[in-house]
Amino acid sequence: EAGIIYLTDSPSDIEKKFKRAVTDSDNSVSYDRERKPGVSNLLDILSVATNTPVAALAENYSQYGKLKTDTGAAVAAMLEPIRTRYEQLKGDPGELSRLLRIGAERAQGVAATTLDRAYRAIGLAPR
């Protein structure tokens, strides 16, 4: 559980999980997938969450603690709109059912097209 971030995790839970993240044995922050996989992973995640190049991030950190804290906060902020929408839908079963119906109809249309192409490709009559 500690290494898993759920979309439904609270911001404080996300930040706690990142604070417990395993880093590397030395104290320097640099990007090196082979020698420093823990720190490199945090830098990759922070890069995605903030849309900042890894090289620029690595230059800004000298301690693991600050890197972990900032990564947790950035991921929590990135996931907050999803978590908020989840909570809204959880409290409105009617809206959730409506959205599921719309999704099912779209999926059925895509699946029918794909199935028709597959039938034609193998020489079977279309449905």
Predicted regions and their residues:
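Conserved nucleotide- and phosphate/pyrophosphate-binding catalytic cores
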Residues: 1-127
